[in-house]
Amino acid sequence: MEDAGLLLIRIMIGVVFLFYGTQKLFGWFGGYGIKGTGQWFESIGVKPGNVAAALSGLGELVSGILFILGVFLPLGAAIITIIMLGAIVKVHGAKGFANGAGGFEYNLVLIAVSIGVALIGSGAYALHF
């Protein structure tokens, strides 16, 4: 049963990061693509915005794929942690803890779950090399 639980968690984390990565990179699912996301990054002081948008979008896309496949989880968790810490520092930290107020609660959950899964391992239902 633990393997099924790990698979469920991995898929959910993967889908979340695939979603946000494709928003930033391609403008899918109501996203703004690299240009629009880059402009937003510039507006919060992250420059060059287009580079930040491309790197964060690519990091989200790659980490999402790694988690879904269950491979290189420490790398995927490190990417997620870096991106989420950036989001806390630049966007959510000043708004406090509560997610409902735009705070960093959700970011911390994503960090903790991704690191936790990386420490436990992918389980039986994953690609194994």
Swiss-Prot record:
* Highest taxon listed in the record's lineage: Bacteria
What are the recorded GO MF terms, alphabetically? oxidoreductase activity
Task: Provide this UniProt record's keywords sorted from A to Z.
Answer: Aromatic hydrocarbons catabolism, Cell membrane, Detoxification, Membrane, Oxidoreductase, Transmembrane, Transmembrane helix
Q: What are its E.C. numbers?
A: 1.-.-.-
In what way does this protein cross or attach to the membrane?
Answer: Multi-pass membrane protein
Q: Which residues cross the membrane?
A: 11-31, 65-85, 109-129
Subcellular location as annotated: Cell membrane
Primary location recorded for the protein, binned into one broad class: membrane
Explain what induces or represses this protein's expression: Repressed by MhqR. Strongly induced by stress due to exposure to 2-methylhydroquinone (2-MHQ) and less strongly induced after diamide or catechol stress. Not induced by oxidative stress due to hydrogen peroxide or methylglyoxal.
What job does the chain carry out? Answer: Putative oxidoreductase that may contribute to the degradation of aromatic compounds.
Q: Which family does it belong to?
A: Belongs to the DoxX family.
**Protein name, entry field:** Putative oxidoreductase MhqP
Q: What is the lineage of its organism?
A: Bacteria, Bacillati, Bacillota, Bacilli, Bacillales
